[in-house]
Amino acid sequence: MTEPTGDQTPEIIGVRRGMFGAKGSGDTSGYGRLVRPVALPGGSPRPYGGYFDEVVDRLAEAVGDDAFTESIERVVIHRDELTLEVHRDRLVEVAQALRDDPALRFELCLGVSGVHYPDDTGRELHAAYPLMSITHNRRIRLEVAVPDDDPHIPSLFGVYPTVDWHERETYDFFGIIFDGHPSLTRIEMPDDWVGHPQRKDYPLGGIPVEYHGAEIPPPDQRRAYN
C-alpha cells in the first residue's frame, strides 16, 4: 500500500494582510505588516495512495462513471486526508452511495463545518462533511462550495439524521440554507438576530454582556491596540 500523495500546486484565491485581515484598526501589535496568501489545496493526481484509490474507484462504480464525472468536481489529498469536492446537485446521491455500498459503508457523518472564503469568487461558502466507515475503519471528507448569492445546499438529514443540529448551526453562523431540512431554524443565536456571526464579512460588534455584576462592552467598544 502506497502512502498518500501530496496535493498539487495550491490555488491562491487572495492575500490577507495583518494578523486578522482587519483594516484601519490602529493595530500596534506588530503584526500589521504580515502578508499571507490565502490558498486552498489543489487537485491531486493518481495514485492517491493508501485506501483512497479504492474508495474513489468504488464510488465511481456505485454511481456510474458518467454520474461520477458530473458529481465530483475535484479529488484533493491534503494532510493525508481524502476530500471529494462534490457538486451540490449530486451531494445526496453521492452520500447515499458512500453510506450504502458494502465496499464503502461510510455509516457515520461526524458533523458539518462551514467556512467562508470571501475571495473564492462564486464559491464563497463551503460546507464540509467528515465521514467515517466503522465497518472498514476509514475516514474521508465531502465538501460542497456555493456562491454567496445562492447559498443553497441539499440537506443530508435524510441520509445522515445526525446532521440535524449541525446543519442548523451552520445555517445560524454562516447563512447556508440546507434545502429539505425538517426544521432549519437558528440553534444558538436568537431567532431575531441579524446576520451570521462566523462569516468574515460580519461586522465586529456585539451587545454588552453582564459577568459577575459587571458589564463587559461589546468587542468594537473595548480598548484594543489603540
From Swiss-Prot:
Top-rank lineage group of the source organism: Bacteria
Enzyme class: translocase
Molecular function terms, GO-annotated: NADH dehydrogenase (ubiquinone) activity; NADH:ubiquinone reductase (non-electrogenic) activity; quinone binding
Substrates-to-products reaction catalysed: a quinone + NADH + 5 H(+)(in) = a quinol + NAD(+) + 4 H(+)(out)
Record's function text: NDH-1 shuttles electrons from NADH, via FMN and iron-sulfur (Fe-S) centers, to quinones in the respiratory chain. The immediate electron acceptor for the enzyme in this species is believed to be a menaquinone. Couples the redox reaction to proton translocation (for every two electrons transferred, four hydrogen ions are translocated across the cytoplasmic membrane), and thus conserves the redox energy in a proton gradient.
Entry keyword NAD: yes
UniProt-recorded name of the protein: NADH-quinone oxidoreductase subunit C
Organism: Mycolicibacterium gilvum (strain PYR-GCK)
Subunit-level organization: NDH-1 is composed of 14 different subunits. Subunits NuoB, C, D, E, F, and G constitute the peripheral sector of the complex.
Pfam families in the record: Complex1_30kDa
Enzyme Commission designation: 7.1.1.-
Family listed: Belongs to the complex I 30 kDa subunit family.
Subcellular location: Cell membrane
Keywords annotated in UniProt: Cell membrane, Membrane, NAD, Quinone, Translocase, Transport
Gene Ontology cellular-component annotations: plasma membrane
Keyword set includes Cell membrane: yes
SUPFAM superfamilies linked: Nqo5-like (SSF143243)
Topology in the lipid bilayer: Peripheral membrane protein
Region (Disordered), start-end ranges: 1-21
